[in-house]
Every structure is written in structure tokens, then in C-alpha cells.
């Protein structure tokens, strides 16, 4: 059966839910889809459908990143439900990288927690421009003054990480109450239930506060490979978010990073299981490649316009080292330290050759909480460029975040 074409009539925006584990991100995501489904602007998804990878069921924690799509009157949204648990920050980093804005979910009963702080920091580091806050579990809060205090604390925290804490919309509500109302009566409209109205209020805030993304559509094509699979009789598909530019069926693209750079031709493009003639910046797409075996391509490579990006092993970067409070190290580290550098979609081991202060002096020891310039050498060449964000990780946890300031080699 030929696949339906994907219609582009409204601006497309990638958003997602971030925040501390068990604060209600997945419940809110389900509530949004069910609320908008009443208007025919979404496919209703229950909590279990969003929390649907086997590992997630086993632990009751969202591990993988779930994608849902919905529309408001003004926009089409692709929404990722990011993992909340510190063990799975790896996916938070790939997930948050796919956001033009995010909904920070904070349980009013707890207020900001360590992962709330970490997710705000990560959102900053991966370049999420704007956040909207959903203050969840309002139904469990008797004390209005306490709600005000939680809100104040959140605004201060957001300002600390250079978001506009004074202006950020904070919408109060209960994802669970809205979800229960919509489950009982899936046709509930705006104005018929106060909890459902809060979901509309949140989407209004997202529509107005999160800007239409400035698409990098005129830059040369680049897509970081997140996953690879084979389609029998058709070839190998690489999936990921198109970071910039456009790609058309028939285009020649380069496969860059980890191994020797090679050319291939695009034979098909799909998005949300529908065929496209071209994919463009911001799309989460599957790209079918001619003459490439599944074994030739892996997560961490990029597809790019030939000659537009090159693989490198050495760079300088500005790094912020997380404090213990933010989930970072307790102890300092020294030149020669070998962590993993999380670049776009993958971890690459590298050595920090040197630390340099803002004054240009060599620094021997770096403490949690420091901001420092690093010189890094990676064991594998990766497609890197100035301004690119990365995370520094060890033993499965993020201990630092940075941005490439200069390519050395």
C-alpha cells in the first residue's frame, strides 16, 4: 500500500516534557493527547501506550523516548516524553536535543528536585530556547501560599540557569485529574471541566511563549543518526532528527564519523510512517540509503551534504562541571582524565589534555561547579563543528556539559 503523504499546513514545532522522575511527565503527555483528541487534533494515547518500551514496564520508569504528535489551532507538534530518571540521562540528552521548547513538569507537592535542576541545565546546554512550566498535582495542595512559594523557587532556579525566570509562564493543574475526566468522557470540550481547561491553558502558553523555531533550512543538510534498521527488499534506513538543511530523494549525501567518510544516494524519506519527497530541518525522519548495509552505519554518525562537515578528534570547549548536588562528581579531576563525550547521539571516549582558565593560565585540578576551558582528544573521529553542544559522562551519569569553542584537528 502506498503511504499517505504528510501534509504541511501549520508550522511544525518539536517539544517535550522534562522534569524529575514521578512528577507526572508521562501522565501529562497522555492528558494532552486525550484533550486535543476531542477536537480531532490528536490521536488519544493512554499512559501505558506512551510508557510502552518493555524496560519501562518492568521498572515503572520511562526509559526510552516516546514520540506523540498533535495539533493546536496554530501549530503541529511532535512531542517527546523524555526519561526522568538519572540513570537514563543519556536519553534525556538525545531527547532534549530534539526540542524547540519544553514543558518542565514540576510536582507542586515536591517542588524543584535534583533532576529538575539537572534537566533545566541540560535544556540550556542542548540549546532548548524556551521552557513553559506545568506545576502538576495542584489537586493535592491545600495551601495556596505554599504553591506561591514553589512557584517563586522555580522562577529563581530558572533565572540561575539563564532562562527568563520572571516571564516564563507557569500553569497550575493536574495531569491525572484531566486524564481521568477525558477517560470517562473523551468528548469533553474546553469550558466543560476546570482540569481539562488547565491543559488548554498550558497549550495556549506553549503556542504563544515557545517561539516558532528558526529553522536552519538554508544551511547544508545534516542529520545525526539515532537508529538504523533494514527494510527487506528496500535497503537500509537511518533515523534521526534533521538538524539543518533539506534532503530530497535522489540527493547524494556523505556518511561522516567513526569510520572513513563515504557517499551514498537517498532513495526514500519517511516521517510518521508517511512518505515525503523531501525532509527538512526539524523533521524526525527515516532516510533510505542506496548500497549501504546495516553494518556500515551506526548511531553517532551523521548524514550530511558532501563537504559540509568533517570528522575531527581534537577540539577546545567551554565546559561546566556539575556539582554533586546536580548529580555530578564529588571529587576533582586532573589533566589526563578520560571520560565519555556525548556528541549528538553517542558517547565517544576522549582524554582531556589540558584545562585552561579564563585568563589563559593552565589549571591542574578542576572541581565540581567549575566552568573551565578544556582541550580534548577523542579516540574516534566524529563530525564536530564550532558551537556544537556536548555532555561529559562517566559510568552512565552526566558530570559536565559544554560547547565546542574551537576545532584543533
From Swiss-Prot:
Keyword Nucleotide-binding among record annotations: yes
Membrane-spanning segments: none
Keywords, sorted A to Z: Cytoplasm, Elongation factor, GTP-binding, Hydrolase, Magnesium, Metal-binding, Nucleotide-binding, Protein biosynthesis
Annotated region described as G4, given as residue ranges: 136-139
Binding site for Mg(2+): 26
Keyword RNA-binding: no
EC number: 3.6.5.3
Region (G1): 19-26
Location relative to the cell: Cytoplasm
Reactions performed catalytically: GTP + H2O = GDP + phosphate + H(+)
Pfam families per UniProt: GTP_EFTU, GTP_EFTU_D2, GTP_EFTU_D3
Residue ranges of the region described as G5: 174-176
Primary location: cytoplasm
Domain tr-type G, residue spans: 10-214
GO annotations of cellular component type: cytosol
Location of region: G2: 60-64
Subunit structure: Monomer.
Role: GTP hydrolase that promotes the GTP-dependent binding of aminoacyl-tRNA to the A-site of ribosomes during protein biosynthesis.
Similarity field: Belongs to the TRAFAC class translation factor GTPase superfamily. Classic translation factor GTPase family. EF-Tu/EF-1A subfamily.
PANTHER family named among the record's database cross-references: ELONGATION FACTOR TU, MITOCHONDRIAL, ELONGATION FACTOR TU-RELATED
Protein name listed in UniProt: Elongation factor Tu
Organism this protein belongs to: Nostoc sp. (strain PCC 7120 / SAG 25.82 / UTEX 2576)
Gene designation: tuf
Amino acid at each position: 500500500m502506498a503511504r499517505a503523504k504528510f501534509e504541511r499546513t501549520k508550522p511544525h514545532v518539536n517539544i517535550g516534557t522534562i522534569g524529575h522522575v514521578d512528577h507526572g511527565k508521562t501522565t501529562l503527555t497522555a492528558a494532552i493527547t486525550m484533550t486535543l483528541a476531542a477536537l480531532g487534533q490528536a490521536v488519544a494515547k493512554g499512559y501505558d501506550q506512551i510508557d510502552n518500551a518493555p524496560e519501562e514496564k518492568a521498572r515503572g520508569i520511562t526509559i526510552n523516548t516516546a514520540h506523540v504528535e498533535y495539533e493546536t489551532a496554530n501549530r503541529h507538534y511532535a512531542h517527546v516524553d523524555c526519561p526522568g530518571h538519572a540513570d537514563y540521562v543519556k536519553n534525556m540528552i538525545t531527547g532534549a536535543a530534539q526540542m524547540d521548547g519544553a514543558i518542565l513538569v514540576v510536582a507542586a507537592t515536591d517542588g524543584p528536585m535534583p533532576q529538575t535542576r539537572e534537566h533545566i541545565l541540560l535544556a540550556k546546554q542542548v540549546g532548548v530556547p524556551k521552557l513553559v512550566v506545568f506545576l502538576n498535582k495542584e489537586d493535592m495542595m491545600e495551601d495556596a501560599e505554599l504553591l506561591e512559594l514553589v512557584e517563586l523557587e522555580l522562577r529563581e532556579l530558572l533565572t540561575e540557569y539563564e532562562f527568563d525566570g520572571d516571564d516564563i509562564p507557569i500553569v497550575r493543574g493536574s495531569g491525572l485529574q484531566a486524564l481521568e475526566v477525558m477517560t470517562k468522557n473523551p468528548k469533553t470540550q474546553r469550558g466543560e471541566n476546570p482540569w481539562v481547561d488547565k491543559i488548554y491553558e498550558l497549550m495556549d502558553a506553549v503556542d504563544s511563549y515557545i517561539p516558532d523555531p528558526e529553522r536552519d533550512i538554508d544551511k547544508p543538510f545534516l542529520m545525526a543518526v539515532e537508529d538504523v534498521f533494514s527494510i527487506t527488499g528496500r535497503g537500509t534506513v537511518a533515523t534521526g532528527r534533521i538538524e539543518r538543511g533539506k534532503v530530497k530523494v535522489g540527493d547524494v549525501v556523505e556518511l561522516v564519523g567513526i569510520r572513513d567518510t563515504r557517499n551514498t544516494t537517498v532513495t526514500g524519506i519517511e516521517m510518521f510512517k508517511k512518505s515525503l519527497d523531501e525532509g527538512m530541518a526539524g523533521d524526525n525522519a527515516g532516510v533510505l540509503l542506496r548500497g549501504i548495509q546495516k553494518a556500515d552505519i551506526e548511531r553517532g554518525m551523521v548524514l550530511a551534504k558532501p563537504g559540509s562537515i568533517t570528522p575531527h578528534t581534537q577540539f577546545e570547549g567551554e565546559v561546566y562541571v556539575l556539582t554533586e548536588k546536580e548529580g555530578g562528581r564529588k571529587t576533582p579531576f586532573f589533566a589526563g582524565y578520560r571520560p565519555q563525550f556525548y556528541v549528538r547521539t553517542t558517547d565517544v571516549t576522549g582524554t582531556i589534555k589540558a584545562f585552561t582558565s579564563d585568563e589563559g593560565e593552565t589549571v591542574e585540578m578542576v572541581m565540581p561547579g567549575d566552568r573551565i576551558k578544556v582541550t580534548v582528544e577523542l579516540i574516534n573521529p566524529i563530525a564536530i563543528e564550532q558551537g556544537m553542544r556536548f555532555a561529559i559522562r562517566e559510568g552512565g551519569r552526566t558530570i559536565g556539559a559544554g560547547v565546542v569553542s574551537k576545532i584543533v584537528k
